[in-house]
Amino acid sequence: MPRVHHSLSNQAFLVLLLFSSIASAAIVEHVLHVKDVVVTPLCKEQMIPIVNGSLPGPTINVREGDTLVVHVINKSTYNVTIHWHGVFQLKSVWMDGANMITQCPIQPSNNFTYQFDITGQEGTLLWHAHVVNLRATIHGALIIRPRSGRPYPFPKPYKEVPLIFQQWWDTDVRLLELRPAPVSDAYLINGLAGDSYPCSKNRMFNLKVVQGKTYLLRIINAALNTHLFFKIANHNVTVVAVDAVYTTPYLTDVMILTPGQTIDAILTADQPIGTYYMAIIPYFSAIGVPASPDTKPTRGLIVYEGATSSSSPTKPWMPPANDIPTAHRFSSNITSLVGGPHWTPVPRHVDEKMFITMGLGLDPCPSNAKCVGPLDQRLAGSLNNRTFMIPERISMQEAYFYNITGVYTDDFPDQPPLKFDFTKFEQHPTNSDMEMMFPERKTSVKTIRFNSTVEIVLQNTGILTPESHPMHLHGFNFYVLGYGFGNYDPIRDARKLNLFNPQMHNTVGVPPGGWVVLRFIANNPGIWLFHCHMDAHLPLGIMMAFIVQNGPTRETSLPSPPSNLPQCTRDPTIYDSRTTNVDMSY
């Protein structure tokens, strides 16, 4: 009898817990107006597309468990999608916002509503345009706090402060599609260039602090093409999360963020009352390519309460722009917070193993054209010697859902077509080397069974020049089991992989001339993009996509698309049924 009573008590407790969980969730609604607006971060007026009249765009605040509803109204002259960078999109792949992958774009004078649940995630993420180069000016912070009543796994800070780092060009964003992309004119902190640049000396981000208080810095690298070092003069910070995954607290005086990465770090105002610079500088990782000699730090200010206005700010010592050891030391020392909120152990059994080479290459110069790349060709990029071609007639997700052929091929290779000394490319290449320099152009995907564990060795190559590539996976976090330089050794290096508390990311920088080992569980059906997060490399084709098949239940299967999903084609027969079986290869 007591056992029955105990069971009933458990049932009552579970019902109460479920009710409490539902009651704590909310529907959070926003409207994003995309318009072309004139702004002047430096000396020159520039017409750019921005959201709700601000650069960066509005910060979106939610709690874990909430439903986010965002109405995007496109009043700009550009096609637009919004990607929710790092959000899992469980059962909502149609809301991922990857242009021509999960949806066709929102065309000018049109609108679309994104709606999805925030499940199993806490921390700082970002939202941004996912049409090439529009991310430069269409972006903002997405902050996910714990459910009501649940604390952070660290002492509550006095204040939370978003810091968004940006890259600025005094030119039309359409020109950024050139190969290679033009060099940026400045970097910004929360939309301000600071005192290193003309015409902006009085426009600098200021963070006012109280001595002895702690501040949670929610740091986002929204720069289009550049890794960034970040430092605060005379202050250390404690990293507590990366890519919205809690970490073992890590004390450091310098951080590096790849494009698309986020860091949550606690700053303690523990220095004498005064004024201190915070600064960012670009990290130039390309081996053999000298860093720009006129690289300027972009600065903001930490101003202590009681500081006199006449005092000169203390300057930080910044690492050299090509300081690979400092970048690697920071990136490789982060570990996950074992037992923390949403932590899960590393799966030991692996179902799919892939070895993916990555890097730059060449694309034949069109006849009657002048190309400025090496050997008078156009720059290209590839994964396993495949240059990814983005579809133009219909999104890949729709093609998959409606069984439309001719849009992509299910043949992305698990291995590169040729084994060679990946990190040391010959100065006088052989015929086979030349083949590797001119990758195949194809829209390739890799199909994975639902709930499979996938392990990927990402090997950077020295074709043209090795540089760090920030690889971003949509729809999942992945375990980063190890980093290294040189060619990955499947015996020696595999023994050193961290299977206990590896860091987890949605975006990771592959070291120049080195490798990274990733592992993730494919538990989210749909088509998910995997690509370099330097936008200059998107048109070069450093990307591929995974198709995760349906699971055994309705809850683990791909949902139908929303009725108002933007369409690329006016042909209504394509959308009649899931067995349309149209061929769009023409």
From Swiss-Prot:
Gene3D superfamilies: Cupredoxins - blue copper proteins (2.60.40.420). Glycans are attached at residues 52, 74, 79, 111, 236, 333, 385, 403, 451. Its cofactor is Cu cation. One of its GO terms (molecular function) is copper ion binding. Predominantly expressed in roots. It is found in: Secreted, Extracellular space, Apoplast. Keywords: Apoplast, Copper, Glycoprotein, Lignin degradation, Metal-binding, Oxidoreductase, Repeat, Secreted, Signal. Residues 33-149, 159-307, 411-552 form the Plastocyanin-like domain. One of its GO terms (cellular component) is apoplast. It is an enzyme of class 1 (oxidoreductase). This is Laccase-9.
